[in-house]
Amino acid sequence: MSVNGTDPTEMTSDDGVETIADELLDQALAERRALVQLCLYALDRASAGVVARIEEGLSSIGVVALRADGERFDPSQHEAAGTVPTDDKSLLGLVAETEVPGFCDRGRVLRAPIVTVYTAR
C-alpha cells in the first residue's frame, strides 16, 4: 500500500502506460545487467581465488561460466585466439584450452569463450 491507500503494483493509466511495478522491474533488470557486466570486468582482472568467488556468486544468480576445453571448435559459439599444432588427428578441431571463459545468463550468451584450437602440424 502506498501513502494514498493504493497498491502501486495495480496502478495503470487509461492509455496503457506502464505501471509503476513495470517501471521498477525494468529498472531492476537494467541494474542487474550493469552489475553482471561490472563483475565480468572485475573477474578478468582478478586473482584465481577472487575469480572463483565471483564465478560462484554469479552462478548463484544464473550467470554461468563457459569453458570449452575438449569441445569441437564452433565459431558460432567460441572465439579463436590462437592455435596449437598437433600430430594427433583425433585432436584436430578441438578446443585445446579456454584462455578467457565466456558467460551465459540463463541461456543467453553474454560473451563467448576465447579459446585456442588444435590444428595440424
Q: Which positions does each model-derived feature cover?
A:
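Long, compositionally biased regulatory regions of eukaryotic proteins
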Residues: 3, 86, 95-97
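A hydrophobic membrane-anchoring alpha-helix module
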Residues: 90-121
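Charged, often glycine-rich, active-site loop that binds/positions anionic groups
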Residues: 76-86
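Intrinsically disordered, low-complexity segments enriched in polar/charged residues with Gly/Pro
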Residues: 59, 87-91
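Charge-dense, E/K-rich amphipathic alpha-helical interfaces
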Residues: 2-78
